[in-house]
Amino acid sequence: MMEYKIVENGLTYRIGNGASVPISNTGELIKGLRNYGPYEVPSLKYNQIALIHNNQFSSLINQLKSQISSKIDEVWHIHNINISEFIYDSPHFDSIKSQVDNAIDTGVDGIMLVLPEYNTPLYYKLKSYLINSIPSQFMRYDILSNRNLTFYVDNLLVQFVSKLGGKPWILNVDPEKGSDIIIGTGATRIDNVNLFCFAMVFKKDGTMLWNEISPIVTSSEYLTYLKSTIKKVVYGFKKSNPDWDVEKLTLHVSGKRPKMKDGETKILKETVEELKKQEMVSRDVKYAILHLNETHPFWVMGDPNNRFHPYEGTKVKLSSKRYLLTLLQPYLKRNGLEMVTPIKPLSVEIVSDNWTSEEYYHNVHEILDEIYYLSKMNWRGFRSRNLPVTVNYPKLVAGIIANVNRYGGYPINPEGNRSLQTNPWFL
């Protein structure tokens, strides 16, 4: 019989004032935020937010503004915020950009922009302009008018508070277990020839500490830019956290990148060795390089006859180097009964490590548990994505970069822009 284990759960989110709330319970989380606030309230310079919209939406905008104002104060504990309105005349780039510039010139901490409908080229041109300028949040009138406004605003503000520099919640994990840092890295293709590399440093509690992306380069340049992007992200992280000792390091490699497995692993090992020599990580650092993959032929069932749903957090051993990990919650019908369906797991392959044989079994399960926990971290809303942030966040970046490039937006480059390097602008 195939070997498997279940991740020991009991995981909670930590929010403000040292309070904890259970994961996957939106009601309890919102209640906890109201009572105790987020884990970290953003530090604002102006206490001003710009709400940019067209006058034809005025009735709905009044409701929206009221909800944003009350929830920022009562749920997110950001007090004395003023929301200023800026009106654009027509849904064209120049008209909207002029109001964006006016808002920035008056001194605001962030911009919330309501568009009439989904216009892909306009959206990505505006989005890229704003990403390079100021924290922002987009909304669409057609969605605002057709959805539960309270639910929509609740989830939207999770993203916006994060972009402003706040931390809604973190994972309440054992500080003695897991990695000192996790690096989510890899590349994503823009087209058949070009790609860009990414690297993000995470704490084990799911917080992103630093991120870098490369310029768009050709596939033949992948390995060169993979190394340089990882080194940049670790340098940035260490410059900001000079006393942070890295004795346990894990690399989560993902993305649609060129198939050069051996060359890729060789470069990643070389990169770790160079980081050791430059004392960016401990000279005795214990590390593992993992391939995390959603696209594979495997499915997991609860039993051979598919009568039971596989438990969330099931770790299935395919070999000593490859595991499957189920991240999904069972789907419940309205009557509360479980709908039995096979689950598409995450494939985790250990392509390289420097663990001893005595450490191996323990460390494998520790990093698998860590991946499962990181799948419960998501600041795009109150529902977890069921994909570790080390993979999910780069996927979000990839979608933005690819579409900005496709639709002629402004190039996005976090290098030298501390706000983009340390805050999740891609949410």
Swiss-Prot record:
Family to which the UniProt record says this protein belongs: Belongs to the argonaute family. Short pAgo subfamily.
Transmembrane segments: none
InterPro entries noted in UniProt: Piwi, RNaseH-like_sf, RNaseH_sf
Named cofactor requirement(s): a divalent metal cation
Function summary: Might play a role in defense against invading genetic elements, using short nucleic acid sequences as guides to bind complementary target strands, resulting in slicing of the target nucleic acid. Binds nucleic acids with decreasing affinity in the following order; ssDNA, ssRNA, dsDNA, RNA-DNA, RNA-RNA. Association of the 5' seed region of the guide strand (nucleotides 2-7) with AfPiwi increases affinity for the corresponding target strand; the greatest increase in affinity is for guide DNA with target RNA.
Residue segments, region PIWI domain: 168-427
Top-rank taxon: Archaea
Miscellaneous comment: This is missing the N-terminal and PAZ domains compared to other prokaryotic argonaute proteins.
Binds guide DNA: region residues: 150-155
Stretch list, region Binds target DNA: 147-148
SUPFAM superfamilies assigned to the protein according to its UniProt record, in alphabetical order: Ribonuclease H-like
Keyword tags: DNA-binding, Metal-binding, RNA-binding
UniProt-reported outcome of changing residue 123 to A: Reduced binding affinity for siRNA
Molecular function in Gene Ontology: DNA binding; metal ion binding; RNA binding
Name recorded for this polypeptide: Piwi protein
Assembly mode: Homodimer probably stabilized by DNA. Each subunit is capable of interacting with a DNA molecule.
Mid domain: annotated span: 38-167
Impact noted for substituting residue 137 to A: Reduced binding affinity for siRNA
Region (Binds 5'-phosphorylated end of guide DNA): 118-124
UniProt domain Piwi: residue ranges: 110-406
Cofactor note: Other ligands are provided by nucleic acid.
Binding-site list for a divalent metal cation: 159, 427
Species this protein is from: Archaeoglobus fulgidus (strain ATCC 49558 / DSM 4304 / JCM 9628 / NBRC 100126 / VC-16)
